[in-house]
Amino acid sequence: MTHDNKLQVEAIKRGTVIDHIPAQVGFKLLTLFKLTATDQRITIGLNLPSNHLGRKDLIKIENIFLTEEQANQLAIYAPQATVNQIDDYDVVRKLVPTLPEHITGVLTCPNSNCISRSEPVSSSFSVKQRDGDVHLKCKYCEKEFERQAVLQDR
């Protein structure tokens, strides 16, 4: 909200608001997580001012509620995101995504020789956090990658 208390992105009556997405990541989330695979209205705010992040993206999806598992998968790209479930214009539940143990069917293995790139199988990674760094290990080629290596491949 701005200092004159006007909303920059219209409020929704019912649905999900994904807030505190790092700037320039909103479109990537929409694509990777197939958030546009609905006929419901989706509102996107890009490069909005944020006291916490400086700039942020925001996604509002009407009449759709993300599960806790779906929210946690967002933490790979947007570790500071919050997922708010809205009903009658009020936040009825706030999810703070945490890194999942596994992520399937979303990311692409950076190993060009991995079978997940050429065979009809869903990619699958185990997620490990060590010393503040996130590493993803491919189920198929068993190679481990830093989070940024997997994210840049997308």
From Swiss-Prot:
Tell me the InterPro entries matching this sequence: Asp_carbamoyltransf_reg_N, Asp_carbamoylTrfase_reg, Asp_carbamoyltrfase_reg_C, Asp_carbatrfase_reg_C_sf, Asp_carbatrfase_reg_N_sf
Q: Please tell me whether the keyword Zinc is annotated for this protein.
A: yes
TM region(s), chain numbering: none
One of the protein's GO biological processes? 'de novo' pyrimidine nucleobase biosynthetic process
Pfam families per the UniProt record, alphabetical: PyrI (PF01948), PyrI_C (PF02748)
What are the record keywords, sorted?
Metal-binding, Pyrimidine biosynthesis, Zinc
Comment on bound cofactor: Binds 1 zinc ion per subunit.
Gene Ontology molecular-function annotations:
metal ion binding
GO CC term, one of those recorded: aspartate carbamoyltransferase complex
User: Could you tell me the superkingdom of the organism this chain comes from?
Assistant: Bacteria
**What HAMAP family does the record tag this protein with?**
Asp_carb_tr_reg
Q: How does it assemble?
A: Contains catalytic and regulatory chains.
**Name of protein:** Aspartate carbamoyltransferase regulatory chain
Q: Which gene encodes it?
A: pyrI
